[in-house]
Each structure stands twice: as structure tokens, then as C-alpha cells.
Amino acid sequence: MTATQPRPTRAGNKLEGRVAFVTGGTRGIGAAICRSFAGQGAAIAAGYSGNQQAAEQFCKDIGSTHPDSRTTVHRGDIGSAEDCRRTIAEVIEQHGRLDILVNNAGITADKTVLKMTDDDWRRVIDVNLSGAFYLSQAALEHMLDRGTGRIVMVSSVIGETGGIGQANYSSAKAGLFGLTKTLAREAAMQVQRKGLTDGIGVTINAVTPGYTATEMLETVPDKVLDALKAKIPLGRLGLPEEVARVVHFLSADASGYITGQVWGVNGGLDM
């Protein structure tokens, strides 16, 4: 941002008073989701696993562009059940509540099935699928007590189509579909039992991004990118902000009658 550019300000107050925890929230799609939430007044808890300096800088950047939105960063290993539960407790302790959980963090360890090691398989499943379960389990306990909350799973179009060398990744991302639908049914059942159906409810949905212009694609050769774009009916890569807008909608009150659904944000790749 240059000195001549206007500083972004709050775009509205639809999420004012809400607290959103976004895993993998300091870069790529996760960072775009955090900015979108902050623009509508939400307090942000951004999860990260590695670069503390970059995470703290992201926190400062959000604070400078959205001074009315409190932002914290939380380090943890999403593949660890203990760390997932600790992080949820930490967010609630620091912010006093948790209204929105976005399970966005993910890793890859691509190898063809005959070359994939046990560790390659387990680590990707642990982070991309099991971590989403542990985080959601801990968050739901808090949300169901209050009768309100939103959980959004960031899956992938690869969970629908499969991908060569991605048996672990595609299995984990496909697993998020079943997890989403099961948690949605259980949450709805619990809310009904508590007699809290008149509120905004507790909903769980998923989005499936396609090939998106993030840091992960910056080192991909142009020829490979051109081949990827040729597969996309809309003929271009997606933008992190385009995914963020759908996640934002599914996290807001306006989506209160939508639960257990999978939303494609992939330029038509899953048609």
C-alpha cells in the first residue's frame, strides 16, 4: 500500500460483535477471509503453524487497515488433537466467545500411490481432515451452549475430482464433505432439543475452491498454469477474495437457513 492509496475502512457492521477463528488465516485464502470478516466488524483470531514473524506482521496489517477490529494470532499444530482443543480454548479465553470457525488450514505431500509413504498419508489426513474434526468438536461445544454459530470447511475441488499424486489430499478433502453433513445434522438436532430454533442457529457448510491465485502457485511455470486454466470453464484462476466472499456469506446471519451444503467456488471445474 502506498501513501497515496486510501486506507481500507470498515465496509459495514454485519459481523460486529462476532469473533471469527480462521485456521491458516495469515496467508492466501485464509488471509482474504480474515480481511473480509474484519471489513464487517468481526474480531479476528488467525491461526498459523510456522512463521511467527509473518503472522505478527499480518496481525499489525489488519490492525492498521481495520483499526476497529481486534486481531490476534494463534500458533498450533492442526494435526494434533491436543493443540486443536488448546487453540479453541485460547481464542475463547482471549476474545470471550467464538462465533465463526473456518477450517481453512491444509497441507500437501503429493506422490503417486505406489510411492506414498505411511507418513505422507497420515500427516495430510491428520491436518486436512482430523484437525477439522477436532477444532469443530471443541467449537461446537461452545456454540451449542449458546445456540448460535457458524462453521465453514474449506475443502477443494480435488475432493470431488481426485488428482494424480494426491490420494491423501483428495481423500481428506472429500472426507470434509461427510464431516460437514454429519456435523450439520447433529448441530441442528441439538439446537432443536434446546428449543433455540428461533435464533440464527448453528450451521455447518463447506466450500470447494478450485485453482486459486495464491502463494502456492507463484512458482508454477507459466506452461503449467496455462494448462490448468485450459481446464477451467471460466478460463482463469480464482482469486482468494472470491472464495472469501462465499465463506463470508456462509458465516453471516443471512445464511441461517443453509446448512450441510457444499458450495463450489472453482470456475465450473466440478460441472
What are these regions (language model features)?
Residues 26-27:
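Conserved glycine-rich cofactor-binding loop
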Residues 40-57:
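Conserved glycine-rich Rossmann-like NAD(P)H-binding loop of the short-chain dehydrogenase/reductase
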Residues 112-113, 120-125, 151, 217, ...:
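Substrate-binding pocket helix/loop in short-chain dehydrogenase/reductase
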Residues 136, 172, 180:
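Active-site helix of classical SDR
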Residues 133, 144, 236-265, 270:
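C-terminal substrate-recognition "lid" of short-chain dehydrogenase/reductases
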Residues 156:
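Residue(s) in the substrate-gating loop at a strand-loop-helix junction
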Residues 188, 198, 203, 258-260:
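Short, small/polar-rich loop/turn modules that mediate ligand/substrate recognition or access, typified
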